[in-house]
Each structure stands twice: as C-alpha cells, then as structure tokens.
Amino acid sequence: MAKTNSINNAAYDQLNKDADRILQLIKVQMDNLTLPQCPLYEEVLDTQMFGLQKEVDFAANLGLIDIEMGKEIMLRLEKELSKLHEAFTNV
C-alpha cells in the first residue's frame, strides 16, 4: 500500500511540475517574445494546456490521482495564467 501511495504522490508531483513549467514558459514568452494577443502565444498556451489536461486525464484514468485533484491542478494553473495575462495587458 505504501508503494501505491508513493506512486500516486509521484504522479501528483509530476503533474504539478508540468503545470509550473507551463506557467514559467508563458512568463518567459511574455517577457521576451510576444504579447498575449499574438496568435503564437495563443497557440503555445492552447497546446500546453491541452497536453497537461491529457496527462491529468491519463493519471486519473489509471487511478494515480483523484479526478478532483486533477481539476485543482488545472484550475490553479488557469488562475495563475489569468493573473499573468491581466498583469501584462494592464501595463
């Protein structure tokens, strides 16, 4: 049972790391490359978010994480991205 919890924790940690990586990628892109209205920005964001959602779905389907935990990861990232987007568009 301890091994199962360890695997579940590892899956949750990895999903959080991936969410943080997306947030960092968008921060760098906004700081150095482009504005939020740019189609490239939208494409990168959509692709990354879609990929993370698929990871969350996969982990939930395997029983590695609870679906609610997955929703929390996605919601946290969406909130952070919204704050970041708002900060850059209100400059």
From Swiss-Prot:
<comment type="similarity">
    <text>Belongs to the UPF0358 family.</text>
</comment>
<protein>
    <recommendedName>
        <fullName>UPF0358 protein Sca_0738</fullName>
    </recommendedName>
</protein>
<dbReference type="InterPro" id="IPR009983">
    <property type="entry name" value="UPF0358"/>
</dbReference>
<dbReference type="InterPro" id="IPR036270">
    <property type="entry name" value="UPF0358_sf"/>
</dbReference>
<dbReference type="Pfam" id="PF07408">
    <property type="entry name" value="DUF1507"/>
</dbReference>
